[in-house]
């Protein structure tokens, strides 16, 4: 029986391809071919980087939530770089640190542009399918996600676009190549709308504020070109936006609550103690719940938020007053301390108001560096910063959990702030890990972690180039600043100002300049004036902390490392001698590590790093390595070990992998009938190199070595 199959070729009638140039390279968008069931989808091709961007939204709002449920996922597939995952299952697992940080970078500029009263689940997914090291997958994903949302039927006030800005040899470079990034003094990820800056994420090598603003302006110009491209696509194939059911309180009910309880809330808020404020709000909310039994828990949370927000914002904009009584540019009380923990390598505690962070520094060998099994530019990290935020730091009674995205993001910000001032590996061949334990949190814990890291590193004796401090700046707006709306920035925001304000602008740096920036906003963007003012306020606050708080406590790194820290030494050996130091199957290097209680790391270029708790052990390992890589010299005396006995003499190992023969006639200064009468296998003996033949065989003499040693002792005795 013959079967007939209809031959049908899918031609994808909705397929469209759009092309432009982005920072000098081709940027291609393909739609209508993949992921037909998503609300919006686009394949982005930038150079040879390919990122598939999708956005989906639930049909109904999620019940019982008082927030907009947005999730942003940046998925790194190692096949994109032609690699197989190193896990046991050879499969990608949970998102790595780099993927989480990329997700946060995309989340922050798109989130403020969604309707705040929408409760439908929205999921944005960016899948890296091909990785070109010269074309950022992160920037491609950000622009692709913006396009996918803008052309979808999901309500959104975008688009935005992003660009990467570098500073190479003093020149601003847009979307620099991998080689340019390695030599850049600036790593700035910028997102913006047509008129405003929406997100800033930066690491910098002590770049001044003026140069930073030039980089921001240059990046914004390129972003405007990308926005024009995105808008042209949306105009052609964009879908009409869906309607949604907004979550809102009854206006009459809210007016009644304001009339009856706003003055009580003002009295409760007027304190610099977070616990007192929270406790004072409880009876007020209980009273509101009793007056309006129809309100749900989510409704009450929203009312509490609105009441506190109204008080905080009104006080700031109308009276220039802060809830804790500080001036607009006044920093909370500060304290710093080092050397708190006796057995750790370094420790520092930084306190700012009710925010307190204890940072511990640990030094390790190069083998302790973190291997990065992801698509980042860095194969491993020698400086690691971990940030822990336990529940007790905010007075919550629950069990701790593993680090989430917030902890990873805050840890990376403090890590990025310190990297520019770390010594080069050749100067200080240690792996460095700092752990910041948040003991109490009332805002700006990430910046307290930067300050705590500086204290801990200097306490550990790490020769950092300059101390680093961090501080944040907040913002309150009333209307659009571009069109006459009022706005005010304030220095060193605490938790309640962060929660109810419009911006958390965090800046870390030294006296010379900026080393890290992270900007979070809740409005649709910032003007240049706001960004410039925030940078200047953070500069002044940073200098105050460095000069008045950190310097009096510890002005420079300690001259010596902790006695509990491993002692690290480095040396160079010829590349062709690496195999001799390692030995067959690693035998030689393993024996040295065991005999001298040390760690030995050898790099491909011949750099050798030796670490040991006891300095003498490390020096003995260095001496042994030198004997391995150096050619034996005639007349040199070595302390060797007898390895074999023959009728005609004994073989002696003078260095791992190097043996020579002591003829029976050279064993002693008298006639020897039997070799075993003088030495046994395993005996340590002194020998002198007397000859090396053309085949590299080494002839040794115990008799000559003993005579030379006796002569030196006699000469020393006469002196």
Predicted features along the sequence, with ranges:
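Extended amphipathic alpha-helical scaffolds
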Residues: 2-58, 62, 243-377, 566-580, ...
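Flexible, glycine/charged-enriched surface loops at secondary-structure junctions
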Residues: 116-122, 157-159, 226-244, 275-276, ...
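Mobile "lid/hinge" segments at catalytic clefts and subdomain interfaces of large enzymes
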Residues: 153-268, 457-559
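Conserved phosphate/anionic-ligand binding catalytic regions in large, soluble enzymes, centered on
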Residues: 40-43, 135-153, 338-361, 442-462, ...
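Long, basic N-terminal domains or extensions that often function
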Residues: 2-245
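Glycine-rich, flexible beta-strand/loop modules in the N-terminal catalytic cores of phosphate-handling
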Residues: 38-122, 128-135, 194, 201, ...
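Conserved helix-loop functional segments at active or binding sites
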Residues: 108-116, 151, 340, 365-366, ...
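Single-stranded RNA-binding regions, centering on S1/OB-family and related RNA-binding modules
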Residues: 564-568, 575-719
């Amino acid at each position: 029986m013959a079967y007939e199959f209809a031959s049908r070729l899918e031609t994808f009638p909705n397929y469209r391809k759009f092309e432009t140039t982005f920072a000098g390279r081709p940027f291609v968008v393909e739609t209508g071919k993949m992921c037909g069931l998503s609300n919006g989808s686009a394949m982005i091709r930038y150079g040879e980087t390919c990122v598939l961007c999708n956005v989906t939204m639930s049909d109904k709002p999620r019940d019982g939530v008082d927030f907009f449920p947005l999730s942003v996922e940046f998925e790194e597939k190692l096949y994109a770089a032609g690699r197989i995952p190193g896990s046991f299952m050879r499969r990608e697992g949970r998102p790595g640190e780099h993927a989480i940080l990329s997700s946060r970078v995309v989340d922050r500029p798109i989130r403020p542009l969604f309707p705040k009263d929408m409760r439908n689940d929205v999921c944005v997914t960016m899948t890296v399918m091909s990785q070109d090291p010269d074309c950022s997958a992160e920037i491609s994903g950000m622009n692709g996600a913006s396009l996918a949302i803008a052309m979808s039927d999901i309500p959104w006030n975008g688009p935005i676009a992003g660009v990467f800005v570098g500073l190479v040899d003093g020149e601003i470079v847009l979307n620099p190549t991998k080689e340019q990034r390695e030599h850049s003094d600036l790593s700035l990820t910028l997102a913006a709308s047509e008129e405003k800056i929406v997100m800033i994420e930066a690491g910098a090598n002590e770049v001044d504020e003026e140069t930073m603003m030039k980089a921001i302006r240059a990046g914004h110009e390129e972003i405007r070109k990308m926005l024009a491209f995105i808008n042209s696509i949306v105009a052609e194939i964009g879908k009409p936006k869906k309607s949604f059911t907004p979550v809102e309180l009854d206006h009459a009910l809210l007016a009644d609550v304001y009339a009856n309880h706003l003055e009580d809330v003002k009295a409760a808020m007027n304190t610099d103690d977070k616990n007192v404020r929270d406790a004072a709000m409880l009876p007020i909310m209980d009273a509101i719940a009793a007056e309006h039994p129809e309100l749900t828990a989510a409704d009450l949370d929203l009312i509490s938020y609105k009441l506190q927000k109204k008080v905080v914002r009104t006080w700031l904009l109308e009276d220039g007053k802060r809830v804790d009584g500080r001036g607009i540019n006044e920093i909370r009380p500060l304290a710093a301390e080092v050397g708190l923990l006796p057995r750790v390598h370094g420790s520092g505690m930084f306190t700012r108001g009710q925010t307190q962070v204890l940072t511990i520094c640990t030094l390790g060998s190069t083998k302790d560096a973190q291997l990065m099994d992801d698509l980042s530019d860095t194969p491993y990290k020698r400086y690691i910063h971990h940030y822990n935020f336990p529940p007790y730091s905010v007075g919550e009674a629950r069990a701790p959990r593993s680090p989430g995205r917030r902890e990873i993001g805050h840890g990376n910000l403090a890590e990025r702030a310190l990297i520019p001032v770390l010594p080069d590996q050749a100067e200080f061949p240690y792996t460095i890990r700092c752990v910041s334990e948040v003991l109490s949190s009332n805002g700006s814990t990430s910046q307290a972690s930067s300050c705590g890291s500086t204290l801990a590193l200097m306490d550990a004796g790490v020769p950092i180039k300059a101390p680093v401090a961090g501080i944040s700046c907040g913002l309150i707006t009333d209307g659009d600043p571009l069109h006459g709306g009022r706005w005010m920035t304030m220095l060193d925001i605490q938790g309640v100002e962060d929660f109810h304000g419009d911006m958390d602008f965090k800046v870390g740096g030294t006296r010379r300049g900026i080393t890290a920036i992270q900007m979070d906003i809740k409005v649709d963007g910032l003007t240049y004036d706001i960004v410039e003012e925030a940078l200047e306020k953070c500069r002044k606050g940073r200098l105050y902390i460095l000069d008045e708080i950190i310097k009096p406590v510890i002005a420079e790194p300690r001259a010596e490392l902790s006695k509990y820290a491993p002692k690290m030494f480095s040396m160079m050996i010829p590349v062709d001698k690496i195999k001799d130091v390692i030995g067959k199957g690693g035998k030689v290097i393993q024996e040295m590590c065991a005999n001298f209680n040390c760690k030995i790391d050898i790099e491909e270029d011949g750099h050798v790093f030796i670490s040991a708790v006891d300095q003498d052990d490390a020096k003995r390992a260095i001496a042994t390595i030198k004997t391995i890589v150096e050619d034996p010299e005639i007349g040199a005396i070595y302390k060797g070990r007898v390895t074999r006995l023959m009728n005609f003499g004994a073989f002696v190992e003078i260095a791992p992998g190097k043996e020579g023969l002591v003829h029976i006639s050279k064993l002693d200064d008298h006639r020897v009938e039997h070799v075993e009468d003088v030495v046994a296998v395993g005996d340590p003996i002194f020998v002198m190199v007397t000859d090396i033949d053309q085949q590299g065989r080494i002839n040794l003499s115990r008799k000559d070595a003993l005579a030379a040693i006796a002569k030196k002792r006699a000469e020393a005795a006469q002196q």
